[in-house]
Amino acid sequence: DVDGLLAQVKETHPELDVLVPAEVGAGMMKNAFAGTFDILQTNIAGVYADGSQGLTAYNIYASDEFMDVAKLAYDWNQKGYYIADSTTLTDTRQTFLKAGSCFGYVGPIHPGTKTQESINSGCDVTVIPITDCVTGTSNVAGFQYTIPTGSDAPEKALAVLNMIYTNPAAQNLLHYGIEGSDYVEVRDGVAGYPEGVDGTTVGWTNETWLTGNGSIGLAWETDPDNIWAQYEEFNNNATFSPAYGFTFDSANVKTEITAVQNVLDKYTAMIYSGMADPEEAVAQFNSELEAAGMQNIVDEMQSQLDAWSAE
């Protein structure tokens, strides 16, 4: 009962902001909706990630699921669970956690999130899964290392990439900083803080999932020693989108995507933060999306999905 937990926190600790944004400017509940659709790298249209509707493309913001999240966001905002001015804040979630001024946030998780967030915030963070794990093309294509065609030293750039995927020492440096100053090997294969250092004083922090092949480096002492095996299980047991591997070519609808994005920028953070009655706001939102060319985008995506599935 997440609602009951948040109510208890608000009653017991009125000095805290119960929830803060997971991402600056994205709204409070964006991540509560993130796993419903495979958005096919658009954040505009997509297919149901669980495969329940096959390869049918939808305007994701006209779905019942989006309305449900909008209603929940509005309800929680009315109950005072959200930090004030959540859509215009510039501080990160880690800043609020470090200051001890909030209870938590709704964000994406994976094995090791507890360690990642604890290190970056200096707090002992607890992670509670509230949705199922799904995998779509955006999950694997959204964060890639590339070598620009105009690189002055492509061979050296490739050598760096090769190093961070094959060299354990490079992984540990990127993950945890300088050995002896920022971390020590507390036992075989496991790193921790040196004596006198903690998450608030350490000289280096990083989003550990961004650094290439983390599985060749040290685990962190707050994670299970088999954290990398847990990653493998996590990935293998996720529900895979029926459009996994499909990439949408937006060339034919660039004008519509620009217009639709302007509407998204106007409404999504506001709706995800419960700052407008969803019964009125979502209807107006979708009316403006249609006027901006949403249906053309959906139709183009459907055409490409049909061609892709026929290959």
Residue ranges and their predicted role:
Residues P21-N43, P108-P111, T126-T131:
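Short, glycine-/small- and polar/acidic-enriched structural segments
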Residues D1-A32, N43-T88, T149-E155, M163, ...:
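Helix-loop-helix "hinge/cap" segment bordering the ligand-binding cleft or interdomain interface
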Residues D3-L6, A70, Y74, Q94, ...:
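Extracytoplasmic/secreted envelope proteins and their assembly/folding machinery
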